[in-house]
Regions:
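Acidic, Ala/Val/Gly-enriched low-complexity intrinsically disordered segments
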Residues: 5-6, 15-22
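Short, often N-terminal, low-complexity regions
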Residues: 11-13
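Intrinsically disordered, low-complexity regulatory regions
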Residues: 20-216
Length: 216
């Protein structure tokens, strides 16, 4: 009796192996999607949400924030940080805004300040929405790069910090900004206004990340 050989067997085996490989890749991707987010992914999610709010307000009000001088931006951030501190200390609220929304407001005001530092006062007060998004994304990307560099050097030490520390550090940065403005922007060894705003922005992101994780 002769032995029959299925000449299609090698081809079928290859197809089956390919199907298994594709299936395993899909399973791996699903596990990754369902797993914990990376810090970069968390950062991007926070920025996306804050940008969405910022652009919606731009659609409603235009770029009315263009009239703000840096001292005014600093005051707005101070007000929000001080409000978070009051909430943390248990002072009775008469306004419904919570800590999360106040951190988001601080983030967006920090970006406003950074944009204002780049735009000359003699430019048009009203900016096109597309330009606003471009400027916002530019500052957010710079802030993220700063976060990545500091995480590389120090590890993610901020994950072990208290929410109160983020607020206190932001308040101290605001006081520094005001002093720099008083000194006409001149510093001897200290960082400038922009560096302080970037730090404030990242403190707000860190606060929002930890709130999202249920740790604050």
């Amino acid at each position: 009796m002769g032995i029959s050989v299925d000449i299609n067997f090698p081809l079928q085996l290859s197809v089956n192996i390919a199907v298994v490989i594709v299936f395993l890749k899909l399973c791996t991707n699903m596990q990754n999607k369902n797993g914990p987010m990376t810090t970069d992914e968390q950062y991007d999610k926070i920025i996306d949400a804050c940008r969405n709010t910022f652009l919606k307000k731009t659609a409603d009000y235009g770029t009315s924030w263009r009239v703000y001088r840096i001292i005014s931006v600093a005051d707005q951030i101070y007000i929000k940080a001080k409000r978070i501190r009051n909430i943390q200390e248990g002072i009775t609220q008469k306004i419904d805004d919570d800590i999360k929304s106040e951190f988001a407001g601080i983030l967006n005001y920090a970006i406003i300040g950074l944009i204002q530092l780049d735009i000359n006062n003699d430019e048009p007060e009203e900016l096109d929405a597309a330009i606003v998004k471009e400027l916002y994304d530019k500052k957010a990307a710079m802030s993220k790069a700063l976060m990545q560099n500091k995480n590389h050097d120090y590890g993610e030490a901020w994950r072990e910090m208290s929410q109160e520390s983020f607020v206190d550090l932001s308040l101290s940065k605001i006081l520094r900004i005001k002093q720099i403005i008083t000194n006409k922007g001149v510093t001897l060894v200290s960082e400038g206004v922009d560096a302080n705003l970037f730090d404030i922005l990242n403190y707000a992101v860190f606060g929002l990340i930890l709130i999202g994780e249920g740790r604050h």
